[in-house]
From Swiss-Prot:
Pfam families: FAD_binding_4, MurB_C
GO molecular function, one term: FAD binding
Cofactor: FAD
Function: Cell wall formation.
HAMAP family per UniProt: MurB
Name of the protein: UDP-N-acetylenolpyruvoylglucosamine reductase
SUPFAM superfamilies, per database record: FAD-binding/transporter-associated domain-like, Uridine diphospho-N-Acetylenolpyruvylglucosamine reductase, MurB, C-terminal domain
InterPro entries hit by this protein: FAD-bd_PCMH, FAD-bd_PCMH-like_sf, FAD-bd_PCMH_sub1, FAD-bd_PCMH_sub2, MurB, MurB_C, MurB_C_sf, Oxid_FAD_bind_N
One cellular component term from this protein's GO annotations in UniProt: cytosol
Gene transcribed to yield this protein: murB
Listed GO biological process terms: cell division; cell wall organization; peptidoglycan biosynthetic process; regulation of cell shape
Known EC number: 1.3.1.98
Locations listed in the record: Cytoplasm
Length: 364
């Protein structure tokens, strides 16, 4: 068992609970308790809590909005640190967000300020501090396009560091922070947005353009872009609603596979074999000769339709990419469904899907 740290004077103002349930802190509403749960509301409290855990050798779990976590039914034997810092700084087109800021609220404030660049990321659950870790993206925008710097606590050097965009190693749903999750604790994120006289950034995503009645590349009023994306997300159960079990999820559970040229050729052969010579899977250039295809398409064509499942964990009735808790599920129920989907897609198309949420105390 990990050592239970003795509370230090630096943590006297933080909220501290023992044997605290973690399920209410996740959008899945799943997972067992933590040995200790600390809620930090300032950067100093975050750093002090991290240092205390590290100095005592206590396992540490960082929790922001809880929208990207799958916590095991046995919980977490260590300190769970809930980052609840707040702060929205605006200087011209520059925006600085504290890690604990609710992301979708921050997007709304930038739209109200007339700034373009993250309006199509409206409705994504979670906190601002998670966005650079995952390189959050949707509907044609990624935060890597607008982040200028990430301020983080470096657990290796015990210093607060400022990491410029070029050193964040951003790629599809990935970054240096995700690659080395035990090293950095994101404290603040800085963005450079665009003042386009009340207009959005050029609309890149075809579905968004169709919904707006414009061509890809056009600009539209900022508020219209945000509201349209919120509508699209709501229709897929991707905007949190406690009354809608389709939103008791982590959003997209699997990342879209990126295939090499050889893998893509083998995939297309499997598609033709299974679906016929005229079948054409989704394909998007991913750089370096690679191709990205759709995880949702793979899941659907493997026989897992919307609403699939008979137990308390099922595929969303609105979107095949979301696995959901129908109210009485356990984490093991969810993982059993995820494993079934992964195995089915692998058998059908030879592609192994990779989970997007972080797993804690369990493996897929």
């Amino acid at each position: 068992m990990p050592k239970r740290p003795t509370p230090s004077r630096t943590l006297v103002h933080v909220q501290e609970l023992h044997d605290a349930p973690l399920a209410p802190l996740t959008t899945f509403r799943l997972g067992g308790p933590a040995t200790r749960l600390i809620t930090a509301t300032t950067d100093a409290e975050v750093i002090a809590a991290v240092r205390e855990a590290d100095d005592s050798g206590t396992p540490l779990l960082l929790i922001g909005g809880g929208s990207n976590l799958v916590i095991g039914d046995k919980g977490f034997a260590g300190t769970a640190l809930r980052i609840a810092t707040t702060g929205f700084g605006l200087d011209g087109t520059k925006v600085e967000l504290a890690a604990g800021e609710v992301w979708t609220d921050a997007v709304a404030r930038t739209v109200e300020a007339g700034l373009a660049g993250i309006e199509c990321l409206a409705g994504i659950p979670g906190s601002a501090g998670a966005t650079p870790i995952q390189n959050v993206g949707a509907y044609g925008q990624e935060v890597s396009s607008t982040i200028t710097e990430v301020i983080a606590y470096d657990r290796k050097t015990h210093e607060t560091v400022t990491i410029p965009n070029a050193e964040c190693a951003f790629s599809y749903r990935h970054s240096r922070f995700k690659a080395d999750p035990e090293r950095y604790v994101v404290l603040r994120v800085r963005f450079e947005l665009e003042d386009a006289d009340g207009l959005s950034a050029p609309v890149k995503y075809a579905e968004t353009a169709r919904a707006l009645g414009v061509e890809p590349g056009d600009r539209v009023p900022l508020a219209a872009a945000r509201e349209t994306v919120l509508g699209l997300r709501s229709g897929k159960g991707m905007v949190l609603d406690p009354e809608d079990h389709d939103t008791w999820s982590a959003g997209s559970f699997f990342t879209n596979p990126i295939l090499t040229e050889a893998e893509c050729a083998a995939f297309h052969a499997r598609v033709r074999e299974r679906l016929g010579a005229d079948a054409v899977p989704p394909a998007y250039p991913a750089g370096d000769g690679r191709t990205k295809t759709s995880a949702a398409w793979l899941i659907d064509k493997s026989g897992f339709t919307k609403g699939y499942g008979s137990g308390p964990a099922r595929i969303s009735t609105k979107h095949t990419l979301a696995l959901t808790n129908r109210g009485e599920a356990t984490t093991e129920d969810l993982l059993a469904l995820a494993r079934e989907v992964v195995a089915g897609v692998r058998d059908a198309f030879g592609i192994t899907l990779v989970n997007e949420p972080v797993t804690v105390g369990v493996e897929l």
